[in-house]
UniProtKB/Swiss-Prot annotation:
Subcellular location: Endoplasmic reticulum membrane
Membrane-spanning parts: 184-204, 224-244, 249-269, 271-291
Family: Belongs to the synaptobrevin family.
GO cellular component: endoplasmic reticulum membrane
The organism of origin for this protein: Mus musculus
Intervals, Cytoplasmic compartment: 1-183, 245-248, 292-303
Record-given protein name: Vesicle-trafficking protein SEC22c
GO biological process, one term: endoplasmic reticulum to Golgi vesicle-mediated transport
Annotated function: May be involved in vesicle transport between the ER and the Golgi complex.
InterPro entries on file: Longin-like_dom_sf, Longin_dom, Sec22a/c
Main location, first listed in the record: endoplasmic reticulum
Amino acid sequence: MSMILFASIVRVRDGLPLSASTDFYYAQEFLECRRQLKTLAQRLARHPGRGCAESCDFLIYFSSSGDVACMAICSRQCPAAMAFCFLEALWWDFIASYDTTCVGLASRPYAFLEFDSVIQKTKWHFNHMSSSQMKSGLEKIQEELEFQPPAVLSLEDTDVANGMLNGHTPVHSEPAPNLRMKPVTALGVLSLVLNIMCAALNLIRGVHLAEHSLQVAQEEVGNILAFFIPSVACIVQCYLYLFYSPARTLKVLLMLASICLGNAYLHGLRNTWQILFHVGVAFLSSYQILTRQLQERQSDYGV
């Protein structure tokens, strides 16, 4: 019998199932385990990182990072390192196929059911490959588990099966792993320098105008905000380029719109070339942010 029986991808914040393996077992114990997995999925926001729970004759493993979690039902003969190795491989494959915006906007269960083909392929590999073929990946996961043990949940003690948590069972959660971005490019460095320069220019002009307006009139408040808001947006663009953030596309569009609208509002205080320069830098930075992706995971799991 296979050691990994079922796998599911869920959204952490609300437990919405995004995809799952379509093979099915009709044993009563397995059906009960499936029901408990669905209930547990709704509580993953309280248990970040890795964890497991016993259910009938099976074990439920889960591993979450960001707003995506992978869950699996395994036989008791399945080593924990192998289960978490499988879940991590599945997680990398999923985020490589769907960005955080798609995940966040999903409104119906199993919106990415076509990912089942990847789940089936990955599950087959782990069920049929020997430990020696996955040695490097298993050793890495085993070291992580020894350093930071996964949360061990008791479905009965925590009343997860009834949709409640009584809060008496201690849970040792693991922080989500750091997501590494691809290396910074020369054009990316240029966009950072130009962004910082634009932020400084906006800040200086805004402060100067604020000091002048406080002494003369109050009708310049709109112009002051039109300097300060793009200044903050430029700094946020620098952050989005350097560090991974969920819903990057939405944030990039918001920052770009703030800079464009702010400069359009300042048409009377800036000439056309100055406005084009600031807007051009904003578009360059937005492009650099959206094209700098997460690093490819190393293929050390034999998948």
